[in-house]
Amino acid sequence: MTLTIDLGNTRAKLTLFSAQTTARTTGNTAAQTAILEHNSVTHQHLVAQLQQMLEQHSNIQRICWCAVGTVPTALTLFLEDLPCHVQQLLPTSPPAGITIGYRTPETLGADRLAAVLGAQSLLPHHTVLVIDAGTCITFDLLRSDGHYLGGNISPGLDMRLKAMHHHTARLPLVTAQGAHPSWGYDTLTALRSGAIWGIHHEIMGYIAQVRAKYPNCCAFLTGGNRYDFNISTQTCNFADESDAIATDNRIFADEYLVARGLYALP
């Protein structure tokens, strides 16, 4: 089995891949997934939870991981002492066959690289555009020849709603939940619809721009807010790559892209 660890600023996502994993399907991708909240006080708790998972699954032979920000010393020491193969994804040292066009790879989030690697593990002969909708929205592009062209970062949904409230005198703070018609019929729906539909058109605009240059590009939507923007998506349950030919209206949704990318490391 392979354990992947996606270590973010406030949480870690641990995903187990069994030997029977079918790379192209979603349903049986992960034998087990755990989301662990962590901060400077609970790093030891994170290590303890990781130790518990390793004890429960003694056949884990490989750990592939990536981290955003500072890696807890306790975790580093723990991983160094493990008898199994441990591999960290670093944008400054990409896997064989991958080249980085980002001018400052040391500032590139490893999870962003892992996500495009995960998308390309599903469609190895396609250019892939990964849109990760979380606190911020990231757009990352990996060409079919393995060249990471770069990416953009845009404010996420909650950030946009809060910014309109904090940087104006009279606009209220609205939540993302609620009516969001194409055209707002009052101030609350105008703010919410402006943010949600603005992101919708932003995402669709990026996809159209990339596909104009790379017609074989497939787009992937991931992240906690991936279903909030009125975008029609399909799961990654396709039999083979020929079943996933990019079209103007085909976008795949997958929550395991980062884990898939780590699992695909050579």
Functional labels for PLM-detected ranges:
Residues 248-266:
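Glycine-rich phosphate-binding/hydrolytic loop that grips phosphoryl groups
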Residues 12, 24-74, 158, 163, ...:
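N-terminal phosphate-binding loop and adjacent alpha-helix
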Residues 179-218, 251:
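Adenine-nucleotide phosphate-binding core of ATP-dependent small-molecule kinases
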